[in-house]
Amino acid sequence: MKPFIAIFLLLQVFLLSAQDQLVLESNLVPGNDTVWVIKPSSYDTSAPYPAVYLLHGRTGNYRSWAELINLQEYADEYQFIIICPDGFYDSYYLDSPVDTSWQFESFFTEVLYPEMAGLYALDKARIFITGLSMGGSGAMYLFLKHPALFLSAGSSSGVMDLNHSSAVHTSLSRLLGDYESNRLLFDSHSPVNQLKNIERSDKHIFFDCGTEDHLYECNNAFRKKCDELKIKATYISRPGKHEGAYWKESIRCHFIFFSNL
């Protein structure tokens, strides 16, 4: 079904250009998806811009990143178009094999991604994706499942193995089925088990995790798997917990990394 798109220009005081709020309707997800697009103030459609899909964590929404950092400043400093979709609170950005109303991976690849390419002057050779926590694992999962769509991906405190998630008996059981009976589905939807998809490619990924984060060992295991498969990966671990104060600082490293590719 062709998505319905409504575009609202959010005029920002003191900014030279508007930020766009789009509403996409699709039967692949349970409701309308609101997408916030932040363009460089100097945005000019005559030249293509690299883009970063920025995914929020569990319980968040399309505006969650704006509560941590000034997205307009990032767009201006790095000259990226920043795209913040709504992950429907706890979609984990995947296609549910048990609930046909939760097909976020298909929504992303079949609706969101092509619509953004059609509406904005994007450099299709320099599309990136990253996020925090659920958004970090979602970003890496989408990248590993569809590496041709992105130049690179990042993750900050991502759930690289869904078996380590605190939501195995709640959100993830709704999406993948009862945890005890569907361990194989939890395994197959984990980024760590999708790394083989870029084993023989020149893709270079970036991820980080705080040393006091409950997902620290999970991310260490992801790094070990990257090393085993000889995948180019930059991994940063530093003091920090699973919280906004950490992500507010860590995300800049992602933009620096992407800008140098």
Question: Model regions: which residues?
Answer:
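Sec-dependent N-terminal signal peptides
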Residues: 3-16
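Non-catalytic cap/lid and distal C-terminal segments of serine-dependent acyl enzymes
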Residues: 19-261
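Compositionally biased, low-complexity segments enriched in small residues
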Residues: 1-3, 155
